């Protein structure tokens, strides 16, 4: 990625693809989106702001139920979306427990009463979506089809919300995002939180700037011991090639020998089966 970036005068146009032409947009041929978090943070720190949808998938779940399936119970889902921090602390769970609950349809291996109640509400939504949409999506999972379908629906809506945000910012500021981050965007400007919140309010999505907190600390370059040329790779290679060479076809290694009697250089082949 960095080589391409340098070769293109420190600018890299990135194309995106979608699995089955729906849902999230993934970079083609590399991009900042694919990098490990610490490396990504180190490269974009002080250059781009990482705008992130707060609590994206749970918020979209609540939006779906409130707007399309109003008869489904969603008390626990609403609790989590509206008071995430306290729900996590009070019930001794973390956000990964929530995301797992959303994405699986089998019974949770947990005895946490709050989490089990949350998952029951999710299961109700999974069941009804599966019956309505199972012929509309490609579902590759045989062991978790309902959870897989819900995830696809969430990613489709997530991408629609991302498009909405991109379009709104472009219309107002005439700028495109520097990169797409699934449920977020990179921009060089830092004053657009209110704009993002206003254009995605209908979906119950708020935005925040994610801090680049996992940077790689680069210290001083280590002082390496001086290596004599004859002991370096190039020196050893040069010395080796004065005596040996390899014929690829037929594969034979030749060694140069010296005749003490007449002083003439002669060749000997060996290692016929290397």
Task: Please report, for each region that a protein language model flagged, where it lies by residue.
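Short basic/aromatic active-site micro-motif
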Residues: 92-95, 99, 149-158, 179-182
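Intein modules and their embedded homing endonuclease domains
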Residues: 5, 11, 71, 236-274
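C-terminal polymerase-core module
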Residues: 105-115, 143-147, 192-248
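Common nucleic-acid-contacting/processivity interface regions adjacent to the catalytic cores
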Residues: 1-42, 246, 256
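Catalytic palm active-site di-aspartate
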Residues: 50-53, 176-188
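Short amphipathic alpha-helix segments
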Residues: 154-171
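Short, flexible, solvent-exposed loop/turn segments with mixed acidic/basic and small polar residues
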Residues: 38-41, 172-179
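Helical catalytic core of nucleic-acid polymerases
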Residues: 20-146
